């Protein structure tokens, strides 16, 4: 039996539009982002997908994308499992900074390392910073030592994988069709795990906003196939635009 999993990056957020490092800052969708969420839902409907379960982060750009997509699928009733483990990678002291200005200051290669390397985190956010997650009530029930002040993709993967093993994988093994609506780097982490992508290859992977990525999996959850829904060229261009965000103007 083929298991179906869709990974969906949230639609364009205000800070995507502004080209700023977002991380765990709770920025909402733009109108374009809301249109992308609806378009993602239409693509999934045209594919004939109906979901048994949905997962998302605790950040509203992902939650609102999920809601917009489910509305197009006429599955507004589907409950969403929300977990901080699906949050975007924490960008530490870079959060809120303009990516192009940061590239002009530190060099494009350094910014590419911070954005796309596997195990090198950005400079950390200080505990005293009011933006640190230890001061956010949505994380109040968690061990403060588990809450990051910065993350690499490697530590993001370490955060995401327990949720995959405990929540998502058992549902797929039970034959459920699963939708995960999350963020560029939490989804890159899952993509790396599912496809056994090398540390070097993951550097070049960019996930576009609002385009569903369909995985077909075997019983043991090894990958049969994966593809973006809709126009492949549109997905390629959207991923290329993500790659260009870290370049100086």
UniProtKB/Swiss-Prot annotation:
Keywords: Gluconeogenesis, Glycolysis, Isomerase
One Gene Ontology MF term: phosphoglycerate mutase activity
Sequence positions that bind substrate: 9-16, 22-23, 61, 88-91, 99, 115-116, 184-185
Short name of one Pfam family: His_Phos_1
InterPro entries, per database record: His_Pase_superF_clade-1, His_PPase_superfam, PG/BPGM_mutase_AS, Phosphogly_mut1
UniProt record, GO biological process: gluconeogenesis; glycolytic process
Enzyme class name: isomerase
Site (Transition state stabilizer) residue list: 183
SUPFAM superfamilies given in the database record: Phosphoglycerate mutase-like
Transmembrane segment boundaries: none
Keyword Protease: no
Keyword presence, Iron-sulfur: no
Catalytic activity: (2R)-2-phosphoglycerate = (2R)-3-phosphoglycerate
Source organism superkingdom: Bacteria
Active site per database record: 10 (tele-phosphohistidine intermediate), 88 (proton donor/acceptor)
Pathway as given in its UniProt record: Carbohydrate degradation; glycolysis; pyruvate from D-glyceraldehyde 3-phosphate: step 3/5
EC number: 5.4.2.11
Quaternary assembly: Homodimer.
UniProt function note: Catalyzes the interconversion of 2-phosphoglycerate and 3-phosphoglycerate.
Alphabetized NCBIfam families for the sequence: pgm_1, PRK14115.1
Entry similarity comment: Belongs to the phosphoglycerate mutase family. BPG-dependent PGAM subfamily.
Protein's name according to its UniProt entry: 2,3-bisphosphoglycerate-dependent phosphoglycerate mutase
């Amino acid at each position: 039996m083929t298991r179906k999993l869709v990974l969906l990056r949230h639609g364009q957020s205000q800070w995507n539009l502004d080209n700023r490092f977002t991380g765990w800052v709770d920025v909402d969708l733009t109108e374009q982002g809301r249109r992308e969420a609806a378009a993602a839902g239409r693509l999934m409907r045209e594919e004939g997908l109906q979901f048994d379960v949905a997962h998302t982060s605790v950040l509203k750009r992902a939650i609102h994308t999920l809601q917009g997509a489910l509305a197009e699928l006429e599955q507004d009733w589907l409950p969403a499992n929300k977990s901080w483990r699906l949050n975007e990678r924490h960008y530490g002291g870079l959060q809120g900074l303009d990516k192009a200005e940061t590239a002009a200051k530190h060099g494009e290669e350094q910014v590419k390392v911070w954005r796309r390397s596997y195990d090198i985190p950005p400079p950390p956010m200080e505990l005293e910073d009011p933006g640190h997650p230890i001061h956010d009530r949505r994380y109040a029930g968690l061990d403060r030592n588990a809450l990051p002040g910065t993350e690499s993709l490697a530590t993001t993967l370490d955060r995401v994988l327990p949720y995959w093993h405990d929540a998502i994988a058992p549902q797929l093994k039970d034959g459920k069709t699963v939708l995960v609506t999350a963020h560029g780097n939490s989804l890159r982490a899952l993509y790396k795990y599912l496809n056994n992508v090398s540390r070097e290859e993951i550097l070049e992977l960019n996930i576009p906003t609002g385009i569903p990525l369909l995985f077909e999996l075997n019983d043991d959850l090894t990958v049969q196939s994966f593809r973006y829904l809709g126009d492949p060229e549109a997905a390629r261009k959207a991923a290329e635009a993500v790659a260009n965000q870290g370049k100086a103007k």
